[in-house]
Amino acid sequence: MCNRFCGLVIKGIKIKPSSEEIKNKLISIGLKPINNVVDITNLVMHELGQPLHAYDLDKIKSGRIEIKTLKDKTVFKTLDEQEIKLSKNDLVICDGDIPMCLAGVYGGYEYSVNNQTKTIFLESAYFNPISVRKTSKNHSINTDSSY
């Protein structure tokens, strides 16, 4: 269900507002600027068509990132702080057995980049589009990444 998963660790990150140029580009395509890291991932996705996701690496406690499914009804808190119950078919990116991201759909709140973030894990992946679509529809979550 995941044909390619690549990641890069970037240390010494300083979270700050994006440049006016990047903010204006995002606003022109209907996106709200958030911070330099999130904004550049959104801009890359819109300009190149490749979704990226940034995680705060210091929040990943198991020391390993896994792509898998979890038990039915496992609770996952999304970036917008909504709690959803996963189905046993939802592909997720995990910190051990803790869901960090709905694969190809939406990130998780607990691992999000914020003003205290110093190190990120930047993900670029290709997930099975049928799996992404099913997960997106199952939870009524439509994001630019899930198209």
Question: Where are the regions a protein language model picked out?
Answer:
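RNA/tRNA-interacting regions in translation and RNA-turnover enzymes
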Residues: 1-147
